[in-house]
A protein has these predicted regions:
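Double-stranded RNA-binding/processing signature
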Residues: 1-177
Length: 177
């Protein structure tokens, strides 16, 4: 019963309701637990979540700082095309329409912004705010060493939850934002 309430609370906090609740539960299972008890742990979900998080953060940065000068929004282009065909004028004296992507930030600044958004302490702080780390399912050694208090473990949990949402949602971009 307690576990059911915890995962109901987690779903409410993240704003996503799982079709397959086992995926959410797996996001909370550490390898130390599965080494002792068998089953699947959160490591692959964490790997997936790390990549999804990178994509989501880059997407947010480009929505904020990127554009195409002819007026198309980056949101339309991020969704794999605006439906408008690119064309070029035959007369070489005429200025061609610019359809090149422009970003108000250079690559270095975008990289620094992305790094700041996904750094360990940022993700760990969010897990602290939500109180999720206290619900990790761990083996005896992890419990004894209080690994659920470590930033890297909280970061792993954050990423594993995102990975679980990615799989459960069928990689739906709306759900992953």
């Amino acid at each position: 019963m307690q576990e059911e309430l915890v995962f109901k609370m987690v779903q409410g906090q993240i704003g996503y309701e799982f079709k397959n609740l086992d995926l959410l539960k797996q996001a909370f299972v550490r390898r130390s637990y599965t080494s002792e008890n068998g089953g699947e742990n959160n490591e692959v979900l964490e790997f997936i979540g790390d990549k999804v998080l990178d994509f989501a953060v880059v997407r947010l940065l480009i929505q904020k700082y990127g554009h195409i000068p002819n007026g198309e929004t980056t949101e339309q282009n991020i969704r794999f095309g605006s439906g408008k065909e690119l064309w070029f004028q035959n007369n070489i004296n005429d200025e061609p329409e610019s359809n090149q992507f422009h970003c108000d930030c250079d690559e270095g600044l975008l990289s620094r912004l992305k790094t700041k958004m996904v750094e360990k302490k940022t993700l760990a702080r969010r897990m602290d705010e939500l109180g999720f780390a206290e619900h990790l399912i761990m083996g005896k050694s992890d419990i004894q060493n209080k690994v659920n208090e470590e930033r890297s473990v909280k970061e792993d949990l954050f990423e594993a939850i995102i990975g679980a949402v990615a799989i459960d949602s069928g990689w739906n971009l709306k759900d992953l934002q």
